[in-house]
């Protein structure tokens, strides 16, 4: 994916940037390189700019990267997908950084991937945003037994987790065509 970094629309939305990258380089290549970022690999400065935009420029200018390249790799999979990256996304659900786990939950929901067991484990995550997004994703991909695990989150101390659990249960009841008792 060689390109001139000045060609990257740094201030465009992530979806717009990735759409342009897909047009230029192909969806499979963008998804593959995004998965490599998610797995902790270096995909070069230009690709980091495509997925991270202006914030990535800060890292290239010396700010600590922390977990951001992995988050951007996962987020890119919302916009560019290839089935070959599913196992990397599954592994991302157990990443040590909560923001990575949260974004991977979002991708699982968007791509409707059958990672229910991994999502159920995240219902007990120490970070409320991860629990909320795991519950939300289970609304899209969970089965009846997993719905019962989501139901327990209706008593979570965090209101956003409770809201997402309630919404997921409604979706599950419709998807599964049965009440969740």
Q: Where are the regions a protein language model picked out?
A:
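Hydrophobic, well-structured mid-protein blocks that either form specific transmembrane helices
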Residues: 88-107
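TPR/TPR-like (Sel1-like) alpha-helical repeat modules
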Residues: 151-160, 170
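Structural detector for internal amphipathic alpha-helices that build alpha-solenoid repeat scaffolds
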Residues: 4-8, 20, 33-40, 67-82, ...
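Residue-level detector of alpha-helix boundaries and kinks
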Residues: 3, 15, 19, 58, ...
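Short inter-helical turns and helix N-cap capping residues of alpha-solenoid HEAT/ARM repeat scaffolds
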Residues: 65-66, 96-97, 126-127, 157-158
């Amino acid at each position: 994916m060689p390109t001139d970094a000045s060609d990257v629309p740094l201030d465009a939305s992530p979806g717009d940037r990735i759409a342009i990258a897909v047009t230029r380089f192909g969806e499979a290549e963008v998804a593959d390189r995004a998965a490599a970022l998610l797995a902790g690999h270096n995909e070069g400065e230009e690709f980091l700019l495509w997925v991270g935009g202006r914030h990535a420029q800060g890292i290239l200018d010396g700010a600590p990267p922390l977990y951001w390249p992995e988050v951007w790799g996962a987020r890119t999979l919302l916009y560019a997908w290839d089935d070959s990256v599913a196992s990397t996304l599954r592994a991302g659900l157990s990443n040590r950084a909560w923001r990575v786990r949260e974004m991977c939950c979002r991708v699982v929901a968007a791509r409707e991937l059958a990672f229910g067991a991994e999502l159920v484990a995240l219902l007990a995550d120490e970070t409320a945003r991860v629990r909320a997004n795991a519950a939300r994703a289970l609304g899209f991909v969970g089965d009846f037994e997993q719905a019962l695990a989501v139901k327990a989150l209706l008593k979570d101390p965090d209101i956003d987790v409770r809201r997402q659990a309630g919404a997921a249960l409604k979706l599950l009841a419709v998807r599964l065509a049965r009440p969740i008792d």
